[in-house]
Amino acid sequence: MDFTKEYLHSVMFEFKRYKTLGDTTFSQLSEEEIQWTYQKNENSISQIVKHIVGNMHSRWTNFLTEDGEKTWRNRDEEFINSYTNKKEMLTAWEKGWQCLFNALETLNENNFTSTVYIRNEEHSIPNAINRQLAHYSYHVGQLVLIGKMLKGEQWISLSILKGESEAFNALKFNS
């Protein structure tokens, strides 16, 4: 497999992994919990999702031909008003990820060396993708942490439980 295909396969896998972490977090939360904030000026899960989705639509719509910071995006608004309910949030979440996956599927050996722009700053394709992968992983980590704080003892872990690494590794290495 050549570098372009391997890289695109790898980032698609990682983006899907972070989407799954978000999906699994949301499945554990109520309508009220997605709106909860730690303090007055902090963001709720719903607001963070609105920001991620706004970023996804801006960055990945016409990825190869337009600046990633679209004139129609209102970033500040993403943090003011959140979704009115969980269903609305999940619908937007799915559309944001679909926009990203659709854009990645257009990439190939013929356009992989193109230059793209984000806020009028030149990026290689891998650099632009890595930038977004880092951005989304940062925010998904926030979503998971808030979910874990809210659920407490009822939280269903999304990773290897404390004290279970040895058993987990035994399964991985003995299979």
Q: Where does each model-flagged region fall?
A:
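Extreme N-terminal tail/first-helix region
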Residues: 1-16
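Short, contiguous alpha-helical
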Residues: 12-16, 23, 31-77, 118-175
